[in-house]
Amino acid sequence: MSFVAYEELIKEGDTAILSLGHGSMVAVRVQRGAQTQTRHGVLRHSVDLIGRPFGSKVTCSRGGWVYVLHPTPELWTVNLPHRTQILYSTDIALITMMLELRPGSVVCESGTGSGSVSHAIIRSIAPTGHLHTVEFHQQRADKAREEFQQHRVSQWVTVHTQDVCRSGFGVVHVADAVFLDIPSPWEAVGHAWDALKVEGGRFCSFSPCIEQVQRTCQALAAHGFTELSTLEVLPQVYNVRTVSLPLPDLGADDLEGNVGSDATPFRSGTPMKETVGHTGYLTFATKTPG
């Protein structure tokens, strides 16, 4: 199993995503002899998981069942163990597009955190690209290395343990894109410029506060970045349902005789009353050649 390439059968050591029902999932490490307790009963790894195809519908000990899904960066994002606040797929999708990531791209990232963005970047740049990710916290860096190894993507990522604001990314003039998710991104803008290729590249910074954005944009302009833009992703979910509205009473002028009768049912979409609010601002910029 790899987060980059699909494999048919579940093997020992794989990470599998158990779908327990609508909106309920859990990630498990498949180990021979291990068991996983679910609300549907016990799932025995040796019997119920190993050797079965991903996507199988598996019956648990109490008669309930789960679907065993192949891991993807999107599924990992909603099931990973949180070591820090993370970005979700809505923001990540825009980041990977605006950074123009593709197979073969070299990317510098800080901080690694829980690895949510890292997995999406690796999937975008494999099989010939590479990610240099910087995490100043030793335990988080060690855990990220362990997860990259378990998920069989370690060949596409190097984890650097250092303060990016003081020491940079550990590489110079190799990156096609730089992504920052740190408290003071303006302090790392100079290192981002140095890490990007001489012929240019793309920059992105995630910040929850507009004051951070202002200082980052000032630093970007001072270092020569161009095409500065800041975006906020606010998805609007619609609830689609079948409704039936009675025809209006038009009085004596209603020649059809349909006063008060029901109209033909139709499908209607209305915005959900509760939607996802502000997560953060995404600031993009370009390093131009020369």
Curated annotation (Swiss-Prot):
Reactions catalysed, as given in the entry: adenosine(58) in tRNA + S-adenosyl-L-methionine = N(1)-methyladenosine(58) in tRNA + S-adenosyl-L-homocysteine + H(+); an adenosine in mRNA + S-adenosyl-L-methionine = an N(1)-methyladenosine in mRNA + S-adenosyl-L-homocysteine + H(+)
InterPro entries associated with the record: SAM-dependent_MTases_sf, TRM61_C, tRNA_MeTrfase_Gcd14
Any one Gene Ontology BP term: tRNA methylation
Residue positions where N-acetylserine is found in the record: 2
Gene3D superfamilies, A to Z: 3.10.330.20, Vaccinia Virus protein VP39 (3.40.50.150)
GO cellular component: nucleus; tRNA (m1A) methyltransferase complex
Any Pfam family hit: GCD14
Keyword field: Acetylation, Methyltransferase, Nucleus, S-adenosyl-L-methionine, Transferase, tRNA processing
GO molecular function: mRNA (adenine-N1-)-methyltransferase activity; tRNA (adenine(58)-N1)-methyltransferase activity
Compartments, as annotated in UniProt: Nucleus
EC number: 2.1.1.220, 2.1.1.-
Transferase in keyword set: yes
Subunit structure: Heterotetramer; composed of two copies of TRMT6 and two copies of TRMT61A.
Family label: Belongs to the class I-like SAM-binding methyltransferase superfamily. TRM61 family.
Role summary: Catalytic subunit of tRNA (adenine-N(1)-)-methyltransferase, which catalyzes the formation of N(1)-methyladenine at position 58 (m1A58) in initiator methionyl-tRNA. Catalytic subunit of mRNA N(1)-methyltransferase complex, which mediates methylation of adenosine residues at the N(1) position of a small subset of mRNAs: N(1) methylation takes place in tRNA T-loop-like structures of mRNAs and is only present at low stoichiometries.
Protein name (record): tRNA (adenine(58)-N(1))-methyltransferase catalytic subunit TRMT61A
Species this chain originates from: Rattus norvegicus
